[in-house]
Amino acid sequence: IVIALITAVAVAGLLRLKVDDSLAELFRTNTPEFRTYEDIDRRFPSSEYDALVVVEGKSLLTRDGLTAFAGATSELQLADGVSGLVSMLSARSKPDANGYAAPIVPDDLPEDPSGLATIVAALKSNDIVKGKFLSDDGELALIVLSLDRSVVAELTAKTVIGGIKEAAERELNPHGLSVKLSGAPVMQLEIRNAVERDQLLYNGLGLLF
C-alpha cells in the first residue's frame, strides 16, 4: 500500500512538472550584473525573442531563388507569433529627388539576365546587406524574425517555431533552397525538449527502482 501511495504521488508530481525554457532563467544569478541585465531587458526587449531563419542554396540569387525568397518572407510575416522581420529584401536604394527610397529588389524581377545581374550586384554591395544578411558568395541569406512574447506564451514556442519552419520549407525547399532555424527561441525549445526528456527518463527510472 505504501509503495502504491508513493507511486501515485510521484506520477501526480511528474504530470505537474514544468520547464522554464528562458535563457535568462537558465543563467540566472543573484549578482548586480544580472539585475542590471533584467532592468535593461524590461526597458528594451532583447533578442531573446528573435528567431533566425538561415536560407542556403546555389540558386539563391537566381530569379527563381529570389522570387521564392520573397514569397517566404511574405509567408513568415503572416505566421503566428511573428511581429516583424528583416532580411536582405529590406534593403533600399538611395532616395530619389522626391525622397523615395525604392527597394533594391523590386516585387517584379526583370526577365533579362543583365537587369537581374544589376540588382544582384547592388544587393551584394549594399553595406547593410553584405556580410550580415547575405554571405559573400551569395549562397546563404539570413531572415531575422521578431517574435511576439504574448503569442509565444499563449501558443507555446513549439507551435510558433514549428509553424515558422513549416512555412519557410514549404516556400523554399521546392526551389532547391534549404532552411535552418537558429536564435535564442530555437535554443530555448531545444533545451526545453532535452530537459523534459531527461525528466521523464529519470522519473521513470525512479519509479522502477
Residue ranges of predicted features:
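Transmembrane helices with small-residue packing motifs
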Residues: 4-32, 55
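Short amphipathic beta-strand/extended segments in non-transmembrane regions
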Residues: 54-56, 70-96
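Membrane-proximal juxtamembrane linkers immediately C-terminal to transmembrane helices
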Residues: 32, 41-50
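Lipid-exposed faces of alpha-helical membrane segments in multi-pass integral membrane proteins
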Residues: 2-9, 205-209
